Design a protein with these regions (language model features):
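Conserved catalytic-core segments of large NTP-driven translation/proteostasis enzymes
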Residues: 179-217, 225-324
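Alpha-helical scaffold elements adjacent to nucleotide-binding pockets in ATP/GTP-utilizing enzyme cores
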Residues: 23-24, 115-118, 122, 139-146, ...
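P-loop NTPase switch module centered on the Walker A-proximal segment
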Residues: 1-68, 98-130, 136, 143, ...
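Switch/connector loops and helix/strand junctions flanking conserved nucleotide-binding motifs
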Residues: 33-35, 111, 137-138, 163-169, ...
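Intrinsic disorder/low-complexity segments
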Residues: 66-99, 213-231
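Conserved C-terminal guanine-recognition region of P-loop GTPase G domains, centered on the G4
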Residues: 126-183
């Protein structure tokens, strides 16, 4: 789990969230330039037509992190997270190597605050994108407060700094007043041209903590006390779901504890609905099947459920054997 980072991009409408996500996927080689199309994560026709994000689209990117070059990781915008107290400060300086960056590109329009809040629950951090010419807008504030309520690490990013209308000093001051961060913590980028986007990828690894399994930490403590290691039940948060005419109900989940293997008998803890995990995997950004979903990972589960009412957003998926 030390090489997993779960994060989202939050901002006001039209401040460049989807464009930044596109650049990240290009730089990490998740999508080739030949297959790239503008605002790739905005899968609905209406989204591309109107230029807004409605449906959450998670994607896993493989990023090779190196420790050379650049300043030491900043902690000024690192909000105190419950995982720090749970794992006893286990989230230390990142080690060089391959990292899984799990991105959820969230809506920025005022009407979709519920979609933002449910995606934040699946993350440890957020990239806050602010238009360098428009500054902090009302919806930006609303989303930042949602992130603060979830105790997420926040990485401030000023976008569109290459435009003539950009007022970097003024908007930087707004961000500093909002987050209480240093000016050096703010990354100045142009998502359209790709300027300084590699710095954002580095900051995600350096400033956002790795996921932690709360039940695994408790099990370790119990084992240290009495020498017995209890079993860890599987728990996965559903942050989105939809019905596919050919495959049934498909869930987007964040695995909090345990694992979900392909073929497992699963149960929804709130509704009591039971089903089968016909296929599990991650999205890069298309579905890529895996043998199982591990702790801390974000991915999908293809089920044999017939309606999304059986697997509601915010419900917890567990294995049948833990619910009997």
């Amino acid at each position: 789990m030390e090489h997993i980072r779960n994060f989202c991009i939050i901002a006001h409408i039209d401040h460049g969230k989807s464009t930044l996500a596109d650049r990240m996927m290009e730089l990490t080689g998740t999508v080739t330039k030949r297959d790239m199309k503008q605002q790739l994560l905005d899968s609905m026709d209406l989204e591309r037509e109107k230029g807004i994000t409605i449906k959450l689209a998670p994607v896993r990117m493989k990023y090779e992190y190196t420790s050379e070059a650049g300043a030491a990781p900043s902690t000024a915008t690192r909000l105190v997270s419950p995982v720090d107290s749970i794992d006893g400060g286990r989230n230390t300086a990142p080690q060089p190597g391959a990292y899984d960056l799990n991105l959820i590109d969230t809506p920025g329009h005022v009407d979709f605050s519920y979609e933002v809040s449910r995606s934040l629950q699946a993350c440890e951090g957020a990239v806050l994108v602010v238009d360098a010419s428009q500054g902090i807008q009302a919806q930006t504030l609303a989303n930042v407060y949602l992130a603060m309520e979830q105790d997420l690490a926040i990485i401030p990013v000023l976008n569109k700094v290459d435009l003539p209308a950009a007022d970097v000093p003024r908007v930087s001051k707004q961000v500093i007043n909002l987050l209480g961060c240093d000016e050096s913590d703010i990354i100045h980028i142009s998502a359209k041209t790709g300027q300084n986007v590699p710095q954002v990828l580095r900051a995600i690894v350096e400033r956002i903590p790795a996921p932690v399994s709360p039940l695994a930490v408790q099990a370790e403590r119990m084992a240290a006390q009495d020498g017995k290691t209890p079993s860890i039940p599987t728990r996965a948060l559903i942050f989105d779901s939809y019905y596919d005419d050919y495959r049934g109900v498909i869930l987007y989940v964040r695995v909090v504890d345990g694992t979900i293997p392909k073929g497992a008998d699963i149960t929804m803890m709130a509704t009591g609905a039971r089903g089968l995990a016909l296929e599990v995997g991650h999205l890069s950004p298309t579905m890529q099947p895996d043998p199982l979903l591990g702790t801390g990972e974000i991915g999908y589960i293809v089920t044999n459920l017939k309606t999304t009412r059986e697997a509601r957003v915010g419900d917890t998926v567990t294995l049948k054997k833990y619910f009997e």
